[in-house]
Amino acid sequence: MSQLPVVLGAGLNTGDIIFQLIAMLILLALLKKFALKPLLGIMKQREDYIGNEISSAEQKHVQAEKLLEEQRVLLKEAREESHTLIENAKKIGEKQKEEIIQAARQESERLKDSARTEIVKEKEQAVAALREQVASLSVLIASKVIERELDEQAQEKLIQEYLKEAGESR
């Protein structure tokens, strides 16, 4: 075991170590200047790009949320407006129904009054015609009675005959 450090130290050349160390430092400096800076620049660009994309996505998400809320508000307003329109249409329909019913009642009353007036008029005409017939029959009967002097029974029989004739002539 005591020979092991001697073996390790025997093959070391300090000049080679220093040369390799200097070459390594120069290589690291060159890598840093020509490879690491562009690599870090590319990584920084990529990081900025990803950050911008995330920021843009967040802004779009916020805009989408805002638009969604606006659409919800518009939809709610449209529903309320349609509900109001339906209610107004129902009220107008009820009002028109009542107006139609009222107009029908008024027309019915007018027709009833017209019919009553017509009935009264025809009744009066019938009574007037009947009075004329009664008057002419009375005159006719009276003239016949005057032509003949009859006893009561014959006079009654004569009146019945003339009334019967008058009824048949109608």
Swiss-Prot record:
InterPro entries tied to this protein: ATP_synth_B-like_membr_sf (IPR028987), ATP_synth_b/b'su_bac/chlpt (IPR002146), ATP_synth_F0_bsu_bac (IPR005864), ATP_synthase_B_chain (IPR050059)
UniProt keywords, alphabetically: ATP synthesis, Cell membrane, CF(0), Hydrogen ion transport, Ion transport, Membrane, Transmembrane, Transmembrane helix, Transport
GO CC term (a single one): plasma membrane
Entry keyword Ion transport: yes
Membrane topology field: Single-pass membrane protein
Family, similarity comment: Belongs to the ATPase B chain family.
Function: F(1)F(0) ATP synthase produces ATP from ADP in the presence of a proton or sodium gradient. F-type ATPases consist of two structural domains, F(1) containing the extramembraneous catalytic core and F(0) containing the membrane proton channel, linked together by a central stalk and a peripheral stalk. During catalysis, ATP synthesis in the catalytic domain of F(1) is coupled via a rotary mechanism of the central stalk subunits to proton translocation. Component of the F(0) channel, it forms part of the peripheral stalk, linking F(1) to F(0).
Name of protein: ATP synthase subunit b
Source species of the chain: Bacillus pumilus (strain SAFR-032)
Gene that this sequence comes from: atpF
